[in-house]
Amino acid sequence: MRDIVFVSPQLYLSSQEGWKSDSAKSGFIPILKNDLQRFQDSLKHIVDARNSLSETLLNSNDDGSIHNSDQNTGLNKDKEASIADNNSANKCATSSSRYQELKQFLPISLDQQIHTVSLQGVSSSFSRGQIESLLDHCLNLALTETQSNSALKVEAWSSFSSFLDTQDIFIRFSKVDEDEAFVNTLNYCKALFAFIRKLHEDFKIELHLDLNTKEYVEDRTGTIPSVKPEKASEFYSVFKNIEDQTDERNSKKEQLDDSSTQYKVDTNTLSDLPSDALDQLCKDIIEFRTKVVSIEKEKKMKSTYEESRRQRHQMQKVFDQIRKNHSGAKGSANTEEEDTNMEDEDEEDDTEDDLALEKRKEERDLEESNRRYEDMLHQLHSNTEPKIKSIRADIMSAENYEEHLEKNRSLYLKELLHLANDVHYDHHRSFKEQEERRDEEDRAKNGNAKELAPIQLSDGKAISAGKAAAITLPEGTVKSENYNADKNVSESSEHVKIKFDFKKAIDHSVESSSEDEGYRESELPPTKPSERSAAEDRLPFTADELNIRLTNLKESRYVDELVREFLGVYEDELVEYILENIRVNQSKQALLNELRETFDEDGETIADRLWSRKEFRLGT
């Protein structure tokens, strides 16, 4: 009973004292004392949500009272303000569910095609609600500035994104009896966007009209309305507010994504495990969960990219259909003209033929231009966009490099210690330093070979000092040769150096080396053949004898230790492969060729060590 405590969730949620007790009470539930913190954490988010809801209600009540007071003080408005209020009311009444998918947005009549425009350069991070709010404000401002009380409104809109930072917004206005209101609205919006682009470089929105819509507007355009700077500043401030909200939402989303990877393992659920294994187990759990979250993010990005590509394909089909219809209408018109002109004179026929050829040439040029455009578009989607995404990912990774390195430090150390089995990994980094140190010891002990002067023998032959020291001669001969050598050295100081012929120098060096070898062989004691090591290329053993020796070598686990020394881990398959290679080929060179593919330069060291084992020596 000492490990049990009684708690009341109702009292805890109402922030009352006495919500926990050591004795049983009515309405209290028993839990372990170790689970008390978990109980508080599970109910904490409920309390936080309730507090945030209360604050929201208080703020909304305050805003409502302020709004009512503003309405009471602003009853008297001029004609311009009343028009804006009426248009705002109309927009609010129709602002819901105006977005349509791209395939549903396709215009089915000429009126719908004329009343359809597009906005280019809108940020891809804008939500549908933010886009509708921006469109409503722009339309209200245009109707107010053009002094129009028309019922013009946004009937539907759609969007098309090429998976870059911007998207295209297609807008279809409702058809009204007053064509002047529609024309003036488009002219004012176009002038407004152009005016803001001159003042602010970050504003990229531009109004684009189709050819039919452009001709329709130009035929009915009277005086182009002027844009007031204060109205342009007002619209730009609305645009910046929406952009700031988008940035804040994106930052919150990034924080949420980061929090999804910042996972903490509850050690209370792992209480039955030894404490020395908890740290590594927690790291493995966090690593696994982070990997799963990353995979889910990649799947989501891939699905988004597939949806964008499907939209592009659908839009391309729509454009192809419109192009075919337009080409068919041109072809039928050309056919009728040719039939009519068949009855004219020969000169007129020749002129018409030239005109048809010119039209066909223009059509071919148009098709070629469209083909180049499609190729460039394909190049953009297949090469440019993936490169941009990859560069952005590299930039983000480089910006957070130290944080990522510190977070995964234990994983990188583990990989460095246990998984460093790359074929190009250098396992003997200090080999050069060891060789240099041994060379210095040899020079200190025996002297520098380059500085030793050649010694002149009695017969006139030159021999190096190192070879002369290794030769053992009778006492009298040594004395006479030393006397001759001293004499020659003294005489050489008085005469210039003689340049020997190249061939004679080679002959002398060969003779001196042969004499040196003869003296050394005479001094070395004879060795028994049974004690010589089988260091030749091929092993002089029968198959049965070789199998016995390989079995002894395998039981000694010498090959296993060699593999572990150069790879860092035990590899049973590699050990079996090495032994099988020796059994089949019985050749050191064949084994060396195979080991170089795995151990690179260390393969020669491994082969030398194996061939120097007692199992491969004769007489053992």
Curated annotation (Swiss-Prot):
UniProt entry keywords in alphabetical sequence: Coiled coil, Cytoplasm, mRNA processing, mRNA splicing, Nucleus, Phosphoprotein, Ribonucleoprotein, RNA-binding, Spliceosome
Per UniProt, the ranges with Polar residues bias are 59-75, 258-270
The GO terms this record gives for MF are: RNA binding
What GO terms fall under cellular component here? Answer: commitment complex; cytoplasm; nucleus; spliceosomal complex; U1 snRNP; U2-type prespliceosome
Q: What is its main location?
A: cytoplasm
The Phosphoserine modification is found at 512, 514
> Which Gene Ontology BP annotations are present?
mRNA 5'-splice site recognition; mRNA splicing, via spliceosome
Disordered: annotated segments? 59-82, 246-270, 323-373, 428-452, 509-537
Q: What else is known?
A: Present with 782 molecules/cell in log phase SD medium.
Name of the protein described by the UniProt record? U1 small nuclear ribonucleoprotein component SNU71
